[in-house]
Amino acid sequence: MPECRSLLQRFMRMRETLNMNKKELIDQLEALGMRPGRGLGQNFLLDSNLLDWIVRNCGASAGERVLEVGPGFGALTEKLISANFNVTAIEYDHRLADFQRKKFGSAPNFKLIEADACKVDYSELFPPKTSYRSVANLPYAISSVFIAKLLDSPNPPQSMFFMLQKEMGERLAAVPGTKAYGALSVRTQLLYDVAVEKIVPPQVFCPPPEVDSALVSFKLRQEKLLPDGLEKSFTFIVRELFNQRRKQIGKLIGKITGKEAAAKILDECGFAADLRPDKLTVADFVTLTQKINEYKGLDNE
């Protein structure tokens, strides 16, 4: 659409450079009368080369819808707009939201929602069959809750590319039998192939976090592992087993189905009763969910 392209070009010519150095960021914070909120996990990404790398490797193409959460002062937002993505940004901090409106309000491919990203109805924002991706330097304090929110959406993103705390990234990409492997690993990997793409040092942020960070990619699986209608049961079973991850699965399943049914379920699945939950693969949890539903008839509404 020529008119849209013309508006975008005009916006890009008139915008101020957003690749701030640390001093410029501090000056901007002071001008807004604010400090980064550690309770909100606000660590602003400054490295222009890293921002360019994120945009090149995030999996999105020009014209695609991209969801950004916690845009802050817009360093990543500017890059996403420049790449001709249709950006929907969600900002919780009203001062930063005002800043973003002034900075990006004239861009035809930018939409701002001032809200708590963990409370947004994503099925309304991106209805079924609406394709979109999510790219963000996620506020670390909300990362696990926000990711779980997208996992529960009836229309999850085609891909996600997030800056996360290194420990969180390792949990999401963890394999069975490791300490990091847990309920969130299983729930995420049910839908996505997850990989830690790059470890990022604290120095590229202001203020620098106390731990290393990681850029993590999530690619939606082409084939569903879980039959439709069993999502609620799957989540329940995964959480129940990992809530007591050091116990044997025979005892844990027995609490759900009864001892006799648990023995039959394990026999039909071919699982030893003395296995620990963290030894089960995502596919194993799918098999368990199907069998437990056959015997127990869990509520999936």
Which role does the model predict for each range below?
Residues 243:
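Active-site-proximal catalytic alpha-helix in oxidoreductases
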Residues 254-255:
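Short helix-coil junctions and helix-kink-helix linkers
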Residues 260-261:
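Alpha-helix N-cap and coil->helix boundary residues
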Residues 271-272:
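Primarily EF-hand calcium-binding motifs
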